């Protein structure tokens, strides 16, 4: 059998590199350079296949465990403590493993014998080649800025006594609710504030933006809660006995018709009316003017209507019965002029009185109603005219 092919020289190229890649060498005639897998601490020889009997011819020399150098595919970056950051280098360190040089010696072969190939190991030394480290920014473990010059290194103990601020008091609001200190609200025409120190409510009149200017026929009302807090103008009016009168109105005093009031801008003015040629007569003989203040006595003697009640007892079919009725008659009314004369004999003033009396009459009838339901005819004289005559004259019988 032909011996298995032995690798003349083998140069492993790592399958993975970080940062830079190393290409595998090209194949040469008579020599094959396989690309080994990742190197671990030991290499296991791959026995060659033989016909009949197999004699292992290791293609790779076993590397002693004491001299094995792992070829990591990736570079391990040391961990950085908390608070410090170290940037990773831009290029990964390349680990290059140079395997020992192996040579094969040809041995004469006798017919019928299988002679394994003899492998002579010239060197078992492994060389680890590292590129120069890449210099990059490295954060220091401690800050490089000296902050001592920005701070006061001397420590002084404060001697200022600490004071405890008491909680702010609350106040009672307009509706009885509790309000916080400094809270403001409006009640009527006042603005109230809660005093947080004393817990009392302080109120002051509301401040108005502009002054109210009224016309000559108006007056200024300063404050009227519910209508205006800053004042307003209203027409001038006058009040008398609970009645309000507009500006320029006139009215008569109800208790004294001779007094007239007038409502002016300055208030009420009073005018008392005087009655000329006052006369003396009974109230029934007075005729008043339109104001009801002055009157004149009726000097004309004339008949005026008067209601007279008539009642009597009468015989009706031999029975007595009471009959009565109210009849509208006439009477003489008016004032007659009196005459004054001087008596030279008695040396005194004599008054001649004249009275208003009936001058003419006419007969009339009236119906009286009796208790038995019957009616009785009553005859009387109705005055149709009057005149002033001497008071001693006899009266006309009615």
Curated annotation (Swiss-Prot):
Question: In this record, what's one Pfam family?
Answer: Cys_knot
Biased composition (Polar residues) is annotated at 1-92
Which InterPro entries has this protein been placed in?
Cys_knot_C, Cystine-knot_cytokine, Glyco_hormone_CN, VWF_dom
The record lists the membrane-crossing segments as none
Principal subcellular localisation of the protein? secreted
Q: Which residues form the VWFC domain?
A: 169-234
Name listed for the protein in its UniProt record = Integumentary mucin B.1
Name the species this protein comes from.
Xenopus laevis (African clawed frog)
